[in-house]
Amino acid sequence: QMWCLSDSRIAYGCDCSRSYKPRNGDVVLPMAWAKVDGYHAENERTIAWGQISGDRAAAYKAVLAAREAEFKILKPGTAFSELYQAAANEFKKGGFGDILPGRVGHGVGNSAHEYPSVAEDNTLLLQPGMVITIEPGLMDASWGGVRHSDTVLITEKGYDRLTQYPNGYLSNR
């Protein structure tokens, strides 16, 4: 499956389709979900359409910092709540403490979204063989949203990223 949300509609998640041509300063979120032999994976990247500014630019920077913070501690024995807190700390540093997401990742397998959630109150520890997403995101109806999502396999010593799309700041220019 592939779909794309843009501008303020990103904040509402899976939205009804419409014809819209992005304008300079918009953010666009293409989402690719795959299913192979009964197992799911997802890969999402926010793309800056032209030059973004204000909350969109600040949120983009905070999401990239949150993503990096999650990946730094991604290994067996790390609690899901620790992953959440690592991302939340970066969101707060970026000035987004008032719109923290409920989760910054989730399990994935026979369904696209499964337990366990990478959430503040989940003390479950990562174990080898788990497949989860790392998907820090910030959403607000007034300016849209920014999210990067990768599917990862937890290994004995760390993780393997199963989705290989480029990371960092992405722009159509």
Tell me the role of every PLM-derived stretch:
Residues Q1-R173:
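Active-site neighborhoods and metal-handling regions in enzymes and metal-associated proteins
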